[in-house]
Amino acid sequence: MCIRDSHHPDQDYQNAGAEICADAAATSANANIILKVASPTLEEMDLIPNGSAFVSLFQTTREIEQVKALTNKNITGFSMHLIPRTTLAQSMDALSSQANIAGYKSVLIGAAHLPVYMPLLMTAAGTIPPAKVLILGAGVAGLQDIATAKRLGAQVEAFDVRPEVKEQVESLGAKFVEVDSDGDDGVGEGGYAKETSDDYKQRQQELIKQHIAKSDLVITTALIPGRPAPLLISTDMVNGMKPGSAIIDLAAENGGNCELTQGGEVIEHNGVKIDGTLNLPSSMQVHASQL
């Protein structure tokens, strides 16, 4: 099999000592350990030999049928999604490395959707103000969003339920949008966010609505491990956005942070583009594979 999209011909694999098989069934037939990037389909699960080991980026809390199939076939499964975000596990933290790529690419896609410049321009014909970009979620993807948008010259704001990321956001040149809170409502384990209280959510929605109405581009990255993506942008908020603005929803695979997001599709609502493109890292396959 030739992986042309990643610019690695069969010969590269053969030079590294691999044997090229005719199809997936032949590849899996006598394997003791199977490595796969994307989550397996149930049809692909049928090809995995009983008693083997399987390593992939599948989500055990969402892909229940795949987990059952592993159990029924006595297959030892390793989910790269469950690797903790710690210093010791950093070299194996595929989730963070791929999120970094998604953050970078989402800004470029967002800029392509906009009918305006990203940077401030001062020309003989007049002055063009910078685009206003709002990032919802300042994890690995969100921080890369900020860095990339700033390099393109945009005016960037970022929101996160974890107050401790304020310093990281500001160090990249963005303004941190913060909900007043007496506790650590959104602080979870391993540097991830957790479910917040109803009172916090209400104040959060009010704050986001104010800032989203002024934004040209909104990129959402908020995820909670093992749960559907939190709803941050309601239809009412989208209706309040400027025509020509855009939303890039990086949480589309987990249900989306925007109420109107349709996974794998780009739609337009009330003049606002909502991009639910899935698996952005695969569009930068060379570095996605390298990392």
Where in this protein do the model-derived segments appear?
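Glycine/threonine-rich flexible loop motifs
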Residues: 43-47, 56, 223-233, 258-259
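Glycine-rich NAD(P)-binding loop of Rossmann-like domains
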Residues: 116-144
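A structured beta-alpha segment of the ubiquitous adenosine-cofactor-binding alpha/beta core
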Residues: 17-32, 39-40, 186-218, 222-235, ...
